[in-house]
């Protein structure tokens, strides 16, 4: 699982050769901790298709502000330097998978 920082964001996300699924999360967020295992499994399952990474809400305020994150967990899917879509507080692994499939199909 990729830990994404402000300093590495351009290379790790915007210039990536595959789509990047980003989880904006925080250690103090119980829902973030609850959905983390599903996010990790999806990241492993889709490793050939995309890169999965996490941005810590408390440690990366510039990225939080840049993307207007006010609710966590928020997942964003990036491709070719652009945000393709986002989902707030996905309820399950199936919801994350559906988000990926629907967003990449656009």
Question: Where in this protein do the model-derived segments appear?
Answer:
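A short beta-strand-turn-helix
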Residues: 2-20, 61
């Amino acid at each position: 699982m990729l830990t994404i920082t402000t300093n590495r964001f351009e290379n790790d996300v915007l210039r990536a050769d595959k789509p990047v699924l980003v989880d904006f999360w925080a250690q103090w967020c119980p829902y973030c901790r609850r959905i983390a295992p599903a996010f990790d499994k999806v990241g492993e399952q889709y490793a050939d298709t995309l890169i999965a990474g996490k941005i810590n809400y408390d440690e990366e305020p510039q990225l939080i502000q840049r993307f207007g994150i006010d609710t966590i967990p928020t997942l964003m899917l990036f491709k070719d330097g652009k945000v393709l879509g986002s989902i707030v507080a996905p309820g399950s692994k199936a919801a994350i998978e559906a988000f990926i499939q629907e967003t990449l199909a656009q």
